[in-house]
């Protein structure tokens, strides 16, 4: 007899399948953009075309008034490719989830689907999806943060109207005051200022118009808005990408206290360890759940996979023995034939009950930079260099240092201290105001920075783009060169606009490596890379025999590859006496945060 639970599950799957055939989300809830808090309106504006490229189905199984979310039979398709198939999404109130998975598996697509309510999220749950920077307007950064709390502004305007009435507003006014008190409305501006300060905005910057900030700083303002609103569901996609190390430390400590539902995609293992209470792993088109932070996830996953492989091998050995026995004695004497039939029944029972699957291993990428040999020092030397974009404002003053092919240097310091400027002085893109930069005649420098992605012709496939960049190269040789950075098969020949940001980053690394430099300057190379790819990059850099200067907000990558930490601050460059984790503890102490 079929159980009620089985009937319910079958009905859910049937509903999901019907919705999928219709190309719409199952049981869609109305947008909360019209709700009292208006949070969703902040993250709206995705084109209809983008939405039509994505198909989502799922059945809400948790109670509509519950603070926890459980969606079964979840499937997500993007450009006709299945990203998630018949899985379960479970988000519990008070938990902070790290969403992991290889580049291109659909992490950002899943966040967008949740943020756009393309899967059934209860109406009373407000969502903030940090996906893009705020608009450039005449509003100050502080005003941009405070003004985003539409519910508070609406209630304060209603108070102004009610107090003018003859009855003084009555019960309605009292209920509004209670709500404003719960929202801590009187200290709204103070809270907004504290958040902005933590993200690197001093008082002068808080008064500055948003249109006068770069895209990276406007993304910080958008992050400040998300933290200020405190939505029920907060979705963050690589929130540390535009932050310096100091702001990363502050954000990590701030999110530790987020007591609603947080889902964060991050390539920083250190950040995930500090923030997350749970991990969701996207693998084989399924969502798998683990309790604990990133390190605990790694340990638990390793133990589970080891046990799974032991069970798999045992089952396969049993199956092999039984099949061999059946084939050998199935037509023998009556006694042996009965035993063979018994084993046949046992085998059929095992198969009906479901056999243990072989562990699906994530494909391990192996990056490789060609060895270039040594050059006699000095290779790159700064002699009493001063530099400023204007005569009245010097970023560096009388700095002296040298970098050789044995150097493995990480540049750290607050945003605006001149880390990227120093890299441009090294390449010759900028010239010193005073002093001299000496480069060896045979020094070949290659620089990675985020703006390289903007130069990619996204209409072209990666293979054709590389063939045009390096004319005369044989196609097979170029395929191999791109493949060394984890882009293989169809990914090489489809337009790059259909690749994930992480896959495009791999194209850039392949382009840099093909230049065969003997010194690499890497400015935030981990943005958009998954954790496995970052580990492969670190391994390749450690095996390479060239010089390295690194700017990164990823504490773990710095710890993996850097031999020296140079602090850029107050027009100077100072060598830090310790490793990067010592520097992190220093930043926490400086900000008055507990270790």
From Swiss-Prot:
<keyword id="KW-0677">Repeat</keyword>
<feature type="domain" description="ABC transporter 2">
    <location>
        <begin position="380"/>
        <end position="595"/>
    </location>
</feature>
<dbReference type="InterPro" id="IPR003439">
    <property type="entry name" value="ABC_transporter-like_ATP-bd"/>
</dbReference>
<feature type="binding site">
    <location>
        <begin position="101"/>
        <end position="108"/>
    </location>
    <ligand>
        <name>ATP</name>
    </ligand>
</feature>
<comment type="similarity">
    <text>Belongs to the ABC transporter superfamily. ABCF family. EF3 (TC 3.A.1.121) subfamily.</text>
</comment>
<keyword id="KW-0067">ATP-binding</keyword>
<feature type="region of interest" description="Disordered">
    <location>
        <begin position="1"/>
        <end position="41"/>
    </location>
</feature>
<dbReference type="GO" id="GO:0005524">
    <property type="term" value="F:ATP binding"/>
</dbReference>
<dbReference type="GO" id="GO:0009536">
    <property type="term" value="C:plastid"/>
</dbReference>
<dbReference type="Pfam" id="PF00005">
    <property type="entry name" value="ABC_tran"/>
</dbReference>
<feature type="compositionally biased region" description="Low complexity">
    <location>
        <begin position="13"/>
        <end position="36"/>
    </location>
</feature>
<keyword id="KW-0547">Nucleotide-binding</keyword>
<dbReference type="InterPro" id="IPR017871">
    <property type="entry name" value="ABC_transporter-like_CS"/>
</dbReference>
<feature type="binding site">
    <location>
        <begin position="413"/>
        <end position="420"/>
    </location>
    <ligand>
        <name>ATP</name>
    </ligand>
</feature>
<keyword id="KW-0813">Transport</keyword>
<dbReference type="InterPro" id="IPR003593">
    <property type="entry name" value="AAA+_ATPase"/>
</dbReference>
<protein>
    <recommendedName>
        <fullName>ABC transporter F family member 1</fullName>
    </recommendedName>
</protein>
<dbReference type="InterPro" id="IPR032781">
    <property type="entry name" value="ABC_tran_Xtn"/>
</dbReference>
<dbReference type="GO" id="GO:0016887">
    <property type="term" value="F:ATP hydrolysis activity"/>
</dbReference>
<feature type="domain" description="ABC transporter 1">
    <location>
        <begin position="69"/>
        <end position="309"/>
    </location>
</feature>
<dbReference type="InterPro" id="IPR050611">
    <property type="entry name" value="ABCF_EF3_subfamily"/>
</dbReference>
<dbReference type="Pfam" id="PF12848">
    <property type="entry name" value="ABC_tran_Xtn"/>
</dbReference>
<dbReference type="InterPro" id="IPR027417">
    <property type="entry name" value="P-loop_NTPase"/>
</dbReference>
